[in-house]
Amino acid sequence: MDTSNSWFDASKVQSLNFDLQTNSYYSNARGSDPSSYAIEGEYKTLATDDLGNILNLNYGETNEVIMNEINDLNLPLGPLSDEKSVKVSTFSELIGNDWQSMNFDLENNSREVTLNATSLLNENRLNQDSGMTVYQKTMSDKPHDEKKISMADNLLSTINKSEINKGFDRNLGELLLQQQQELREQLRAQQEANKKLELELKQTQYKQQQLQATLENSDGPQFLSPKRKISPASENVEDVYANSLSPMISPPMSNTSFTGSPSRRNNRQKYCLQRKNSSGTVGPLCFQELNEGFNDSLISPKKIRSNPNENLSSKTKFITPFTPKSRVSSATSNSANITPNNLRLDFKINVEDQESEYSEKPLGLGIELLGKPGPSPTKSVSLKSASVDIMPTIPGSVNNTPSVNKVSLSSSYIDQYTPRGKQLHFSSISENALGINAATPHLKPPSQQARHREGVFNDLDPNVLTKNTDNEGDDNEENEPESRFVISETPSPVLKSQSKYEGRSPQFGTHIKEINTYTTNSPSKITRKLTTLPRGSIDKYVKEMPDKTFECLFPGCTKTFKRRYNIRSHIQTHLEDRPYSCDHPGCDKAFVRNHDLIRHKKSHQEKAYACPCGKKFNREDALVVHRSRMICSGGKKYENVVIKRSPRKRGRPRKDGTSSVSSSPIKENINKDHNGQLMFKLEDQLRRERSYDGNGTGIMVSPMKTNQR
């Protein structure tokens, strides 16, 4: 056996001079780590320690043990669960197969390490076999402990390399996992940002759609707001209103009565104001031609009676100024009747001077033309309904009803419960009668040229103003006052002490003689009543029939009405809409109409009307009915009162739905009176019971007082 490559001889240990550079076996087998045995003194120490006694093993046994240890040193196929490693369980999306592919073939590396170690051992084994021929005797005496140490050192160096590679692979896997986690977080943040951007985009698109719809709806006539700054006024009349800086001009909102009851007229004509101001633009306060598209938004002007030979080009033109609430005096009285919130004044400007007595020059407020000398044109002023956004004040119910400063009219001139006869409308009221302050610019006293009264009613006293009753209306829906006050031919002899509850308005008390009337028919549209329901909730149940009647579309109800106001009040009862509530302590009643609330409030007052039998009443008409029944010691016959005995209560609708016009004795007698005899008797009785004081003021005397005298 050749022992030239052997580095250890047990028999010559004491005289060993070992050179590491000339030992081929040492350089081949331990070339990777020669520093382990670089010190000569270390080998001398090992020789003196008799290593043969420490590792008493032969070569075959050593090889078998080392191979078993190498097989047991297989590297794990996944990351170790130490403190610095990343837990794979935190990433549920990574399964075993994926980790095997990402672990950079650690299993193959471990196998390569095992093969390398085996090849080294085999090479060492061959070298030793070749050296046995030279040093066979020496090697036979040499123990196998030193060979064991050499192979163990080679194995340790290989294991250290594999551990280094394993640590590098583990650190690389942790780095990749951290990068994946960061990428996922960035992806989530980007998705959230995308969602926010999509939401903002949808909101922007919705706003654009709303703006587009607003622009499409605003393609119609545009009216200038009173607060808008306009160029200075010029000399034209249209420029006075179109370019005025004063907030007292506003576009026409409604030309209807404040009761919502349209008064009919025949031969409706179309009017359109196309005159331009000095700036070349059409004035904003012009009326559009009446057609189906403007019936709900624009109101045509009043019909003006003109000469037959007058051309269409010389017809009067209209603009509608508006008296602001801040310039209207608050003429609040104890009126028991609803009045208009504001006064809408329709000014009629004539193109040509009208000098004829019958050329339609009604009394009204004058407007001074700027820069033009001469007499001011004639105008006509009428009481119009308030704007839609302002609700009327309930007299005595200020605490629970929205209110504004407004001109109120005493119910002494309105609520007289007068039987219907031939009636005259007036639309000309003096400035002081309306209670308008003199601070309004460019206003003159009313003209004295149009104090003209028509018809055969010149002998009637104009001091009595009544509400316009409708004998064609249903009894269960009481009629409200019309937009124009009415002078009746036959004032009522019953409610002559109404002023006890409602004092005369100071504005009208001294100027009542200035009221003049003229006969006219006015187109009108309905206004929206005071309601607690959303806008349009009542009108959707109203159906206008071809015969100018109105049908209720509420489910299960097929009633028809001749007045729009009545059907609107009727629908409010269906919808439980009662905006007028009683403010008396402890009373929670509410009503659809204001006059029902007023009548109810009288029940909380002291009963001021007493019968000789001892029974008291809140209302004078109730006392008259009681005495006319002749059921007590205070019974009395009245010529103009006919009592129809009915088991049903007054003011309640009949169950069969039949007409109840006969529920009012006065209406019944008037309807039966074809020759006018009853009307004459009523008027004659009223004149006989009226006395005058020294100032000529008419005092209404109760029938009971007349009887006592």
Curated annotation (Swiss-Prot):
<keyword id="KW-0010">Activator</keyword>
<feature type="zinc finger region" description="C2H2-type 2">
    <location>
        <begin position="580"/>
        <end position="604"/>
    </location>
</feature>
<feature type="modified residue" description="Phosphoserine">
    <location>
        <position position="505"/>
    </location>
</feature>
<keyword id="KW-0805">Transcription regulation</keyword>
<dbReference type="GO" id="GO:0000981">
    <property type="term" value="F:DNA-binding transcription factor activity, RNA polymerase II-specific"/>
</dbReference>
<keyword id="KW-0963">Cytoplasm</keyword>
<dbReference type="GO" id="GO:0000977">
    <property type="term" value="F:RNA polymerase II transcription regulatory region sequence-specific DNA binding"/>
</dbReference>
<feature type="modified residue" description="Phosphoserine">
    <location>
        <position position="492"/>
    </location>
</feature>
<feature type="modified residue" description="Phosphoserine; by CDC28">
    <location>
        <position position="522"/>
    </location>
</feature>
<dbReference type="GO" id="GO:0031496">
    <property type="term" value="P:positive regulation of mating type switching"/>
</dbReference>
<dbReference type="InterPro" id="IPR036236">
    <property type="entry name" value="Znf_C2H2_sf"/>
</dbReference>
<feature type="modified residue" description="Phosphoserine">
    <location>
        <position position="488"/>
    </location>
</feature>
<comment type="function">
    <text>Determines the mother-cell-specific transcription of the HO endonuclease gene that is responsible for the initiation of mating-type switching in yeast. Recognizes a specific sequence in the promoter of the HO gene. Activates EGT2 transcription in a concentration-dependent manner. Synthesized during G2 and early mitosis.</text>
</comment>
<dbReference type="GO" id="GO:0010458">
    <property type="term" value="P:exit from mitosis"/>
</dbReference>
<dbReference type="Pfam" id="PF00096">
    <property type="entry name" value="zf-C2H2"/>
</dbReference>
<keyword id="KW-0539">Nucleus</keyword>
<keyword id="KW-0238">DNA-binding</keyword>
<feature type="compositionally biased region" description="Polar residues">
    <location>
        <begin position="245"/>
        <end position="264"/>
    </location>
</feature>
<keyword id="KW-0597">Phosphoprotein</keyword>
<feature type="short sequence motif" description="Nuclear localization signal">
    <location>
        <begin position="635"/>
        <end position="659"/>
    </location>
</feature>
<dbReference type="GO" id="GO:0045944">
    <property type="term" value="P:positive regulation of transcription by RNA polymerase II"/>
</dbReference>
<feature type="modified residue" description="Phosphoserine; by CDC28">
    <location>
        <position position="664"/>
    </location>
</feature>
<feature type="region of interest" description="Disordered">
    <location>
        <begin position="443"/>
        <end position="483"/>
    </location>
</feature>
<keyword id="KW-0479">Metal-binding</keyword>
<feature type="zinc finger region" description="C2H2-type 3">
    <location>
        <begin position="609"/>
        <end position="632"/>
    </location>
</feature>
<feature type="modified residue" description="Phosphoserine">
    <location>
        <position position="300"/>
    </location>
</feature>
<feature type="region of interest" description="Disordered">
    <location>
        <begin position="644"/>
        <end position="677"/>
    </location>
</feature>
<dbReference type="InterPro" id="IPR013087">
    <property type="entry name" value="Znf_C2H2_type"/>
</dbReference>
<feature type="modified residue" description="Phosphoserine">
    <location>
        <position position="376"/>
    </location>
</feature>
<feature type="modified residue" description="Phosphothreonine">
    <location>
        <position position="339"/>
    </location>
</feature>
<dbReference type="GO" id="GO:0006357">
    <property type="term" value="P:regulation of transcription by RNA polymerase II"/>
</dbReference>
<feature type="region of interest" description="Disordered">
    <location>
        <begin position="245"/>
        <end position="267"/>
    </location>
</feature>
<keyword id="KW-0862">Zinc</keyword>
<protein>
    <recommendedName>
        <fullName>Transcriptional factor SWI5</fullName>
    </recommendedName>
</protein>
<feature type="DNA-binding region" description="A.T hook">
    <location>
        <begin position="647"/>
        <end position="659"/>
    </location>
</feature>
<feature type="compositionally biased region" description="Acidic residues">
    <location>
        <begin position="471"/>
        <end position="480"/>
    </location>
</feature>
<keyword id="KW-0863">Zinc-finger</keyword>
<dbReference type="GO" id="GO:0036033">
    <property type="term" value="F:mediator complex binding"/>
</dbReference>
<keyword id="KW-0804">Transcription</keyword>
<dbReference type="GO" id="GO:0000978">
    <property type="term" value="F:RNA polymerase II cis-regulatory region sequence-specific DNA binding"/>
</dbReference>
<dbReference type="GO" id="GO:0000082">
    <property type="term" value="P:G1/S transition of mitotic cell cycle"/>
</dbReference>
<dbReference type="InterPro" id="IPR050329">
    <property type="entry name" value="GLI_C2H2-zinc-finger"/>
</dbReference>
